[in-house]
């Protein structure tokens, strides 16, 4: 970690919502600050595995595993994510922010695993909640890059 830095961000997401799946290198740590839910994590080509979380849980996605965070509880969820970052090696936008359709490692909602939405609806139903993602799905469509041929 010589001349390295730790980069961090806090993210909060409302009840009934979830983040896009993405993959990146090793070392990211996600500490759950509020809420309850779960994360799906999986290596390329395999089925997603579900990991429940609550306040105080530490989520550490393995190197280049896809992962996705879901707020299935009755309150907003918040997490603190941090990882090593070296400014001298930074070049442009992180690959985990770029759609797989453009060569990145972020999975657009339109391209997510078929089980994602049904698992989420089932988890929310345990709290008598429903997904609040329809506007998010619709907002993504006009900006989606075309699928590779």
Predicted features along the sequence, with ranges:
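Intrinsic, low-complexity N-terminal interaction/targeting segments
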Residues: 1, 5-9, 39-41, 46, ...
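A short glycine-rich, His/Asp/Glu-containing loop-to-beta-strand
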Residues: 1-20, 27
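Conserved hydrophobic/aromatic beta-strand scaffold that supports enzyme active sites
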Residues: 8-12, 29, 50, 58-60
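Glycine- and acidic-residue-biased ligand/ion/polar-headgroup-sensing regions
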Residues: 14-15, 24-44
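Short histidine-centered beta-strand/loop micro-motifs
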Residues: 18-24, 50-52, 70-71
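Histidine-centered metal-chelating micro-motifs
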Residues: 18-19, 58-59, 64-69
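Short acidic-glycine-tyrosine-enriched beta hairpin
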Residues: 43-63
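Double-stranded beta-helix
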Residues: 70-149
């Amino acid at each position: 970690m010589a001349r390295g830095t730790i980069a961090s961000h806090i993210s909060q997401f409302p009840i009934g919502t979830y983040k896009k799946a993405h993959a990146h290198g090793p070392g990211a740590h996600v500490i759950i600050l509020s809420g309850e839910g779960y994360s799906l994590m999986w290596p390329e080509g395999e089925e997603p595995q579900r990991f429940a979380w609550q306040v105080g849980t530490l989520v550490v996605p393995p190197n280049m595993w896809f992962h996705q965070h879901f707020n299935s509880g009755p309150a907003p969820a918040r997490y603190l994510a941090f990882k090593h970052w070296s400014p001298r090696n930074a070049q442009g936008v992180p690959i985990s922010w770029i759609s797989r359709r453009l060569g990145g490692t972020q999975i657009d909602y339109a391209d997510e695993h078929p089980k994602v939405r049904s698992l989420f609806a089932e988890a929310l139903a345990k709290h008598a909640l429903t997904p609040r993602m329809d506007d998010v799905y619709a907002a993504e469509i006009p900006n989606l890059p075309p699928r590779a041929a």
